[in-house]
UniProtKB/Swiss-Prot annotation:
Binding site for S-adenosyl-L-methionine: T85, T86, E104, F105, D129, A130, D149, V150, A151, Q152
Subunit text: Interacts with nop5. Component of box C/D small ribonucleoprotein (sRNP) particles that contain rpl7ae, FlpA and nop5, plus a guide RNA.
Family note: Belongs to the methyltransferase superfamily. Fibrillarin family.
Enzyme Commission code(s) on record: 2.1.1.-
Keywords: Methyltransferase, RNA-binding, rRNA processing, Transferase, tRNA processing
Name of the protein in question: Fibrillarin-like rRNA/tRNA 2'-O-methyltransferase
Length: 226
């Protein structure tokens, strides 16, 4: 087994003895597992295997994502942080110099995040409604990246509204879109085109990527604020 750097800073490729490749992040909190992920040690460092079936961002990277604006030192607003599966890998990437402000609507789900953030001090959990960014405006500074994973019909509008308040000029948004959450009566491709048009009303749309086979009827969009 060996580990090499991915072209995205903070992401690694683990090559198993059978030649299969997986992606991973270097564990910011050695010894901590967040979601039962496989942890390996290589040359004195600990790496957490990033499971693409549990993380839309992980799926996007494995599917050949070209634009990944989250880097070491980035400040990230994470909408729909849930119990922190993907956010824990983002935490590894941004490191102690970076910060994640994670908004979650469900108190029950946010409670599951508490044991993780006790050790991962670069994650700030916020109980809030992503459709109402004014509600957490006092808690979140201007950010480099907004990542959104909120399965709601208005998910494109949610990203735009939050970007107007929090995203730096030239900053990036990333949004995981589940077509069935927007309109179950339409074909996914039709829904994705409508979302792209809505996003393009405010952002420059940089990339769109299918998350199949890891997530059915999902796409990830990368956008840039002018």
């Amino acid at each position: 087994m060996k580990v090499k750097k991915h072209r995205f800073p903070g992401v690694y490729i683990v090559i198993d003895d059978d030649g299969s490749e997986k992606i991973a992040t270097k564990n910011l909190v050695p010894g901590q597992r967040v979601y039962g992920e496989r942890v390996i040690k290589f040359e004195g460092e600990e790496y957490r295997i990033w499971n693409p079936s549990r993380s839309k961002l992980g799926a996007a990277i494995l599917n050949g994502l070209k634009n990944f604006p989250i880097k070491p030192g980035s400040t990230v607003l994470y909408l729909g942080i849930a119990s922190g599966t993907t956010a824990s890998h983002v935490s590894d990437i941004v490191g102690w110099e970076g910060k994640i402000f994670g908004v979650e609507f469900s108190p029950r789900v946010l409670r599951e995040l508490v044991p993780i953030v006790e050790e991962r001090r670069n994650i700030v959990p916020i109980l809030g409604d992503a459709t109402k960014p004014e509600g957490y405006r006092a808690l979140v500074p201007k950010v480099d990246v907004i990542f959104e994973d909120v399965a709601q019909p208005t998910q494109a509008k949610i990203l735009i509204d939050n970007a107007k308040v929090f995203l730096k000029s030239g900053g990036y948004g990333m949004i995981s879109v589940k077509s069935r959450s927007i309109d179950v009566t339409k074909e996914p491709e039709e829904v994705f085109k409508e979302v792209e048009r809505e996003l393009a009303s405010y952002f420059e749309v940089v990339e769109r990527l299918s998350l199949e086979p890891y997530e059915k009827d999902h796409a990830l969009f990368v956008v840039r604020k002018p």
